[in-house]
């Protein structure tokens, strides 16, 4: 599926609906959207809107072909944090999206109507006391979307399972409602009370991620790559990236350090071993435009 197709239908439909709506006061989010992602992705990403004022808007513009800058800002102003899990394949990229947002129920019903090319299926689940709870699952034939509450959006792969995870967590129907690996969750989780304002990523299949980032085939026998990205306080057009590499065998570390120095240019970066198999590389400079092109889904 082309990248424009992932968010395009969803955001285009919502655009018409929310443009005439006043913002609704935000109540507490009842279930953390990050819990709704599954373990089937090879790369995970957290993008808080506070990380860069243009980034969420650029994600919208990159997804919706032809959308104006002002319309993209309108949509992005209602999105606080985007969590994404993705698998890049030869002909398409498979996505799973969960987000903190603010899309009123009336706007969702208006946007995701049959008139606009959407069909709605009902997912009925039991609340644990014998009472049915209904959730709407919307489809345009290519994309699935659901809004289990006003401040939670689910888009992409396995949306019914995401909604069921939400339901189980909200009604305390299982001890551990989420199936997302705890290491991934703990790295990406966002504390709204004490936000760090950073983009964070976790590659559980790191070889393909490094190839995407550097353009080179780097095989270091890694367990994972994770890190964070934030705006460079000294340059408005630049990000600063940190990487953490966990190796299966320490013998790969020396070769990796040399290859990474060539790939990233580590002259001004800090490189050190936290453990014999855990290499940390920080203070890597990358232009915002370059990162936008990588991260815009």
Which residues does each PLM region occupy?
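A short acidic-to-branched-hydrophobic micro-motif
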Residues: 81-103, 230-249
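Short Gly/Thr-rich strand-loop-strand
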Residues: 106-150, 262-278
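C-terminal motif of bacterial Sec signal peptides marking the signal peptidase cleavage site
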Residues: 18-20
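Bacterial N-terminal signal peptides that target proteins for export
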Residues: 1-8
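Hydrophobic helical h-region of N-terminal Sec-dependent signal peptides
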Residues: 11-15
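Bacterial signal peptide processing site
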Residues: 22-24
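Leucine-rich, highly hydrophobic segment in Treponema pallidum outer-membrane-associated proteins
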Residues: 196-297
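An internal, short helix-loop-strand segment that often contains or flanks glycine-aspartate motifs
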Residues: 28, 32-82, 121-141, 146-237
């Amino acid at each position: 599926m082309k990248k424009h197709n992932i968010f395009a239908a969803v955001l285009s439909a919502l655009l018409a609906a929310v443009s005439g709506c006043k913002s609704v006061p935000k109540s507490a989010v009842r279930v953390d959207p990050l819990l709704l992602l599954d373990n089937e992705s090879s790369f995970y990403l957290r993008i808080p809107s506070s990380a860069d004022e243009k980034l969420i808007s650029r994600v919208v513009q990159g997804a919706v072909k032809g959308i104006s800058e002002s319309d993209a800002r309108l949509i992005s102003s209602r999105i606080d944090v985007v969590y994404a899990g993705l698998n890049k394949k030869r002909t398409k990229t498979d996505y799973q999206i969960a987000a903190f947002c603010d899309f009123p129920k009336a706007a969702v019903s208006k946007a995701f109507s049959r008139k606009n090319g959407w069909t709605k299926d009902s997912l009925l689940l039991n609340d644990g006391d014998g009472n049915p709870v209904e959730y709407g699952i919307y489809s345009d034939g290519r994309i699935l979307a659901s809004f289990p509450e006003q401040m939670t959006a689910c888009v992409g792969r396995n949306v019914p399972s995401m909604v069921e995870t939400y339901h189980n967590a909200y009604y305390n129907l299982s001890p551990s409602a989420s199936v997302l690996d705890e290491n991934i969750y703990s790295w990406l989780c966002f504390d709204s009370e004490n936000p760090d304002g950073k983009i964070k990523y976790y590659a559980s299949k790191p070889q393909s991620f490094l190839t995407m980032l550097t353009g080179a085939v780097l095989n270091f026998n890694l367990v994972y790559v994770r890190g964070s990205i934030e705006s460079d306080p000294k340059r408005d057009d630049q990000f600063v990236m940190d990487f953490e590499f966990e190796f299966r065998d320490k013998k790969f570390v020396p070769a990796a350090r040399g290859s990474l120095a060539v790939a990233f240019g580590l002259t001004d970066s800090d490189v050190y071993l936290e453990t014999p198999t855990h290499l940390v590389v920080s203070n890597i400079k990358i232009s915002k435009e370059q990162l936008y092109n990588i991260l815009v889904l």
